[in-house]
Amino acid sequence: MNYFILILVAALLILDVNCKKDGYPVEHSGCKYTCWKNEYCDKVCKDLKGEGGYCYINLTCWCTGLPDNVPLKTNQRCNGKRK
């Protein structure tokens, strides 16, 4: 039984587990993608290797299933200014 647990833990550590995350992706300037249509956001999110996305109430793109290496909006700064 102990060997099974040890092998299971070792296998989990060896496997590269890629977690997916949801959120507002940012452009190079640090600003969120602005939008009017869901189709635009869906394309942006899929171009970033996400599962999909939609235009949220505040007219910015919300993406689902993004890889870990895609930066998400974490503060209110855009182009170095508070927005």
Swiss-Prot record:
One annotated GO biological process: defense response
Q: What residue range is the signal peptide? A: 1-19
Q: Which family does it belong to?
A: Belongs to the long (4 C-C) scorpion toxin superfamily. Sodium channel inhibitor family.
Q: Which sequence ranges form a coiled-coil region, renumbered to this chain?
A: none
Disulfide cysteine pairs (residue numbers): C31-C78, C35-C55, C41-C61, C45-C63
Query: What is the superkingdom listed in this entry's lineage?
Result: Eukaryota
Q: Which organism is it from?
A: Centruroides vittatus (Striped bark scorpion)
Q: Per the database record, which ranges form the LCN-type CS-alpha/beta domain? A: 21-79
Q: What is this protein called?
A: Alpha-toxin CvIV4
Q: Which UniProt keywords apply?
A: Disulfide bond, Ion channel impairing toxin, Neurotoxin, Secreted, Signal, Toxin, Voltage-gated sodium channel impairing toxin
Q: Which GO terms describe its cellular component?
A: extracellular region
Enumerate the subcellular locations listed in this protein's record, separating them with semicolons. Secreted
> Further remark, if any?
Negative results: has a minimal effect on Nav1.5/SCN5A and no effect on Nav1.8/SCN10A and Nav1.9/SCN11A sodium channels.
Alphabetically, the GO molecular function entries are: sodium channel inhibitor activity; toxin activity
What tissue expression does the UniProt record report for this protein? Expressed by the venom gland.
One Pfam annotation, family name? Toxin_3
The entry's function note states: This toxin significantly slows the fast inactivation of Nav1.2/SCN2A (EC(50)=580 nM), Nav1.3/SCN3A (EC(50)=1310 nM), Nav1.4/SCN4A (EC(50)=530 nM), and Nav1.7/SCN9A (EC(50)=1340 nM). The toxin does not affect the peak amplitude of Nav1.7 currents. On all channels cited above, the toxin requires depolarizing potentials to slow channel inactivation. In addition, the toxin has no or very weak effects on the voltage-dependence of steady-state inactivation, and on voltage-dependence of activation. In vivo, it produces paw licking in mice equivalent to the effects of whole venom.
Lineage per the UniProt record = Eukaryota, Metazoa, Ecdysozoa, Arthropoda, Chelicerata
* Record has Manganese as a keyword: no
**Description of its domains:** Has the structural arrangement of an alpha-helix connected to antiparallel beta-sheets by disulfide bonds (CS-alpha/beta).
